[in-house]
Amino acid sequence: MTKEEALNKFAQLGAVWFGNSKQHFAFSAYCRLQGWNKLADKWKEEAEEEWEEAEEVLNRLVELGCKPADLQELMKTQEFPFCDDPKLQIEGDYQPEAIKELSELAEAFCDDYPTKKLIEKWIEGEKDHMAWECQYLNYIDKLGYENFLTAMM
C-alpha cells in the first residue's frame, strides 16, 4: 500500500467512524424508546467512543495536510443502514475483518508513529466492540431472542 493509498484509507475510516457513531446514537435512542435500556446504554457508549475516535482521525488528517471538507465528501458516499431489529443491527455491525484491515493500515504507517499508534489503539477498541457483539449474539442463541430483549430492559 502506497503512502497516498494509506492516507486515503485512513480518511475513509474517519468517515466510517463518524457515520457509525451517528448510526449508533440513533439506534441507542430507538432501543431506549422500546424500553431496552441496557442495550440503549451499550450502543450510546459505543457511539460516544466512535465519535471521539472520529475526531482523532479528523485531527490527525488535518495534521497530515488533509482538509476536513475531503472527509465530509467521503461521508456522503458511505451508507449506514438503520435496523429496527437489535439482532440484525448487531449482526450487521459485527465485522471481524475490520481488525485485519486496521492492522494492514497500521503497517502502512510504520514510518508515522503517531498515526500508527492511533490505529493500534482503535484495533484494541474494535476487538472489545466485537467481543461484546459476539457475546450478545451468543446470549440471543442461548436465551432466545425474546428473552434476550427482556433481559435488556
Task: Write out the residue ranges for each language-model feature.
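Iron-associated oxidoreductase/ferritin-like identity signal
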Residues: 1-153
